[in-house]
């Protein structure tokens, strides 16, 4: 069981002054205690002193503390508790609908989850995930919608988490099926990477994978995986084939196909490329399922702790709010039982 006080001490260890540690804890406790939208006014009221509203507002949007240091402490805290080598990083895009353009980074963009154009923010989040736990760690707000913007955001996040932890946990990137142009070229060399790609991306595969070719053909990933799926007994709805990018680059790679319902047949629903060493198909399949769990965490606990609730034009304010809301998510995930007992005790009193 994780003690909440010890958890806060670990998260806020890099704040230089006691005042910042107090404000950070107030803000996180307010995020955990407020029902409904997590405005600064509601957060201040939840922690018992509405007069703290201006102090908390300045702490988030006007103070000089580094959100990177807090994110680093959050990453260190959750990976240490998971145990050496356990877990993976998951990089996932999210859409945050907003009413009007009064907040930073608001654009009109297509939201795959809602299957329509929405007005709101687009962001990428880096989450730490094990089979039991999920915690958001770091964020990038997109200021444009081009592929270049998205690739840059992915690259920054992958580089960041690799540097913060200094380990080689796999990084799973599901940026909405980016084509493989240069999804994360430099970070690919720093940590094992698994990237969801467009099913039509060309891969160099062994001749026996695609019938009728004497030399190593270049085939669409979905075709190669459909062929190998017919030739082998796939595990839990996944099949793999050794592959390489025709133009060279990182390698050797494994292409992974994922089929719905646990049965291989026809065109795969998802295609992934991986350089995770010595990974079995079932292990790669487990990694490929992590983004769905993260998306569920974003919709449920993420909404409950206010990850989508920041209002304001300050980009530093957005980053600080997202970081503190990520800390609130971690506290609820790691010490939720203790929180419930505290709430029950308050209600009984």
List where the protein language model places each region.
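An internal, acidic/charged active-site-proximal segment
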Residues: 144-252
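Short amphipathic alpha-helical "interface-anchor" segments enriched in bulky aromatics
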Residues: 278-312
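Electropositive, glycine- and tryptophan-enriched low-complexity nucleic-acid-binding patches
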Residues: 58, 113-168, 264-269
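Gly/serine-rich nucleotide phosphate-binding loop at the start of the catalytic core
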Residues: 1-58
């Amino acid at each position: 069981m994780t003690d909440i006080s010890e958890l806060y001490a670990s998260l806020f260890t890099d704040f230089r002054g006691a005042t910042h540690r107090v404000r950070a804890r107030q803000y996180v406790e307010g995020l955990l205690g407020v029902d409904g939208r997590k405005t600064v006014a509601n957060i201040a009221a939840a922690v018992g002193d509405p007069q703290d509203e201006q102090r908390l507002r300045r702490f988030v949007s006007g103070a000089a503390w580094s959100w990177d240091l807090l994110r680093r402490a959050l990453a260190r805290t959750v990976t240490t508790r998971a145990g050496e080598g356990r877990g993976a990083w998951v990089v996932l895009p999210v859409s945050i609908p907003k009413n009007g353009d009064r907040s930073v980074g608001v654009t009109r963009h297509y939201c795959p989850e809602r299957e329509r154009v929405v007005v709101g923010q687009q962001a990428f989040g880096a989450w730490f995930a094990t089979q039991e736990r999920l915690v958001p760690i770091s964020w990038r707000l997109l200021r444009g919608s081009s592929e270049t913007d998205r690739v840059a955001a992915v690259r920054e996040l992958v580089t960041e988490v690799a540097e913060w932890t200094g380990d080689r946990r796999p990084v799973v990137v599901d940026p909405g099926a980016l084509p493989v142009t240069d999804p994360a070229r430099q970070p690919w060399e720093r940590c094992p990477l698994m990237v969801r790609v467009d099913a039509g991306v060309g891969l160099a595969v062994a001749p026996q994978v695609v019938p009728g070719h004497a030399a190593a053909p270049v085939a669409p990933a979905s075709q190669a995986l459909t062929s190998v799926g017919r030739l082998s007994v796939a595990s839990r709805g996944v099949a793999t084939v050794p592959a390489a990018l025709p133009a060279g680059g990182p390698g050797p790679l494994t292409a992974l196909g994922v089929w719905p319902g646990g049965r291989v047949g026809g065109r795969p629903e998802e295609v992934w490329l991986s350089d995770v060493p010595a990974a079995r198909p079932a292990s790669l399949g487990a990694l490929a399922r992590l983004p769905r769990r993260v998306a569920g965490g974003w919709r449920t606990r993420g909404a409950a702790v206010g990850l989508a609730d920041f209002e304001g034009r300050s980009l530093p304010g957005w980053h600080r709010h997202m970081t503190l809301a990520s800390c609130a998510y971690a506290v609820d995930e790691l010490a939720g039982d203790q929180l419930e007992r505290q709430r029950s005790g308050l209600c009984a009193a």
